[in-house]
């Protein structure tokens, strides 16, 4: 019994010592989407704040493919020592159902590190679409089934699922155009190649405030301070579309708890800082 107790003490001490010296090299944050979208933007903003706290470079690597599965496969092959992380959102729960042979089980393979934000969704339309508000968009889709084009960053993404949910609620039909990442979608919304998009506020707020696109609804109970001129979905006649997306950091299963706690504390320090809050609100 004494020997067993001493073994537990040694294991705990080794983990604590590892956390005290962690990190010893560059920390890589994998995201499973192309540059330009919400995940990419948030990950890079947080990575910039983490580097001085952890006193090591924190880099973001875009590892795309199979709705994020390829990025998680890379994470699962990495050492569970905290130097490789993944930044994702609730769409990770869809991956095993889209790719059942991919060998990925979030409950089995991942260790949660820190939640970062719960973000509402925004419907925005191209300035060239002629659409002024949510009721007129819905009426247009019902009069012209399949004629409206909505873009998203790929199958299984939160944007894709949000658009499918919206169409189901309003009983209308539109073409859901799937891109490889959100960046190209935004470019096509601004140029008028497609009519609109539903995505997170972090992605669409800059387009609306700069008048490069027109936000017509936000999925919050009340209007948000950053876009006070944008009505809620409920104001537009669709109260059922009440949706917010969570984003967070994950590590490979088996990462020592003291290391996870060190990372969580550092991430919390970043997202609570005035500098980070100012960047996100812009």
Regions of interest found by a model, annotated:
Residues 14-16:
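N-terminal signal peptide c-region/cleavage motif recognized by signal peptidases
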Residues 202-203, 275:
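Alpha-helix/helix-capping structural signal
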Residues 19-109, 147, 155, 171-200, ...:
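N-terminal (or domain-start) structured segment
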């Amino acid at each position: 019994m004494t020997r067993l107790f001493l073994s537990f003490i040694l294991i705990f001490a080794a983990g604590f010592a590892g956390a005290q010296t962690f990190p010893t090299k560059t920390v890589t944050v994998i995201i499973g989407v192309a540059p330009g979208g919400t995940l990419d933007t948030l990950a890079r903003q947080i990575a910039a704040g983490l580097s001085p706290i952890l006193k090591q470079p924190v880099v973001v690597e875009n590892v795309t493919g199979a709705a994020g599965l390829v990025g998680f496969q890379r994470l699962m092959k990495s050492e569970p020592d905290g130097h490789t992380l993944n930044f994702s959102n609730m769409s990770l729960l869809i991956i095993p159902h889209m790719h059942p042979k991919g060998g990925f089980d979030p409950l089995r393979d991942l260790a949660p590190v820190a939640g970062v934000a719960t973000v509402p969704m925004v419907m925005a339309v191209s300035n060239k679409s002629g659409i002024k508000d949510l009721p007129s968009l819905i009426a247009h889709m019902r009069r012209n089934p399949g004629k409206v084009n909505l873009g998203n960053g790929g199958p299984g993404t939160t944007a894709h699922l949000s658009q499918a949910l919206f169409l189901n609620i309003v009983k209308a039909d539109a073409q859901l155009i799937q891109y490889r990442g959100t960046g190209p979608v935004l470019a096509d919304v601004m140029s008028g190649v497609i009519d609109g998009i539903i995505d997170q506020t972090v992605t669409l707020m800059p387009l609306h405030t700069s008048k490069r696109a027109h936000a017509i609804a936000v999925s919050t109970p009340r209007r948000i301070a950053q876009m006070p001129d944008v009505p809620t979905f409920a104001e537009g006649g669709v109260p059922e579309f009440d949706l917010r997306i969570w984003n967070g950091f994950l590590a490979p299963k088996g990462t020592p708890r003291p290391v996870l706690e060190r990372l969580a504390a550092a991430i919390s320090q970043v997202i609570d800082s005035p500098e980070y809050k100012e960047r996100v609100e812009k």
